[in-house]
Amino acid sequence: MAESCNKKHPVLAVVGPTATGKTALGVALAEAFEGEVISADSMQIYKGLDVGTAKVASEETHGIPHHAVDILEPDEPFSVADFVALAGTLEADISARGRLPILVGGTGLYVQSFLYGVRFAAEKTPDGLREQLSAEMAEKGPEAMYKELQVADPEAAAAIHPNNQVRVLRALEHFRATGKRLSEQKAQSLPPERPYRSLVLGLDFPDRAQLYRRIDLRVDKMLDAGLLDEAKLVYDHRQTYRTAAQAIGYKEFFPYFEGTAPLDACTEKLKQASRNYAKRQLTWFRHMDGVVWLDASAPDVTARAVQLTREFLAKG
């Protein structure tokens, strides 16, 4: 068994809620250990959605390659199965070149599915089911469809925001197509042994008020950087940019564009939605096995992360 473990590639992950400094720490660790970053963010995969997804600026990368960023158009679908396949290819290439793959992001389902080696069976959606569900969504509304999901698959519903119509429909589609809950599929698709030797570093602020202040400040900075123009682009293409149109950072401004709410109210709504999202991220990562939590407010947080990574790599 020890020999098998030694053959596994080491993979580092930096996780945690939004606005905790994951990007900067990922870059620092990549500089210290000849690493390359794989973005584990479900929205940074899309081109043109830069401000609202808090993509790393070129000057902030310090020359470190960042993968799984800006590779799809906003109207192209991208699933967790797609991410696991893409990240697997990227990891193999990075490791083959003698560099350290560093997963950085806050999409917990992506991180966990990749590190745990979840296998996704190809399932055929019955003809007309997707169209039927979309029609039901239009007729009954998001709240009714979410309540249906809560009955059919409570665990999936708990992990999906009620306003995320795309994911609600996907979960219902899976249930109606297979008669099984997503959680059942996940349990059946876990391999007996994880494919990578991993260290998962989690960033959080012990003072929740400090995290919320950082989130509010980040929203203000995003607005200064052109978030409203980006949100208007998504609004204008909302029929085709369906995933982006459900994303936090864009949909909150739709009432402003429709003339039904002032900008200040929409901005406050975004701040509240971001705070709620941070809570859900924390809940997800707190339930993941083996996360080593670091105080993001500590002056020596980077030094501590470097030390832990050095010890982790030495064990390989």
Q: Which residues does each PLM region occupy?
A:
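Phosphate/pyrophosphate-binding catalytic cores of soluble transferases and nucleic-acid-acting enzymes
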Residues: 1-316
